[in-house]
Amino acid sequence: MDRVEQMKQIQSEGLALFTKKNADYGDAFAKYGVIGVLMRIEDKIQRSLSISKNGVNLVKDEGIKDTLLDLHNYAAMALMLLEEK
C-alpha cells in the first residue's frame, strides 16, 4: 500500500471514529472554541508521551494508535472551527 492509500485508510478510520463520537457527544468540542480543542490536543500529546515512554496505557483499551487517531481528529476539529470564523 502506498502512502496515499495509507492516508486514505487513516482518514477513513478517523471519520468513522468522529461520526461515532459526534453521535454520542454532538458538537461539544466547539463549546470552548479552538483553545478548547488545543487543550484536548495537549492532553492527547501527554498521553502519547506517557505511552511511548512508559509503555503504560493510562486509559484502559487506549493505546498509541487510538491516541494518534484522536489527535488526527482534534486537528481536523480545530480546522473546522477556524473555518467558521
Where are these regions (language model features)?
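Intrinsically disordered, low-complexity regulatory regions
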Residues: M1-K85
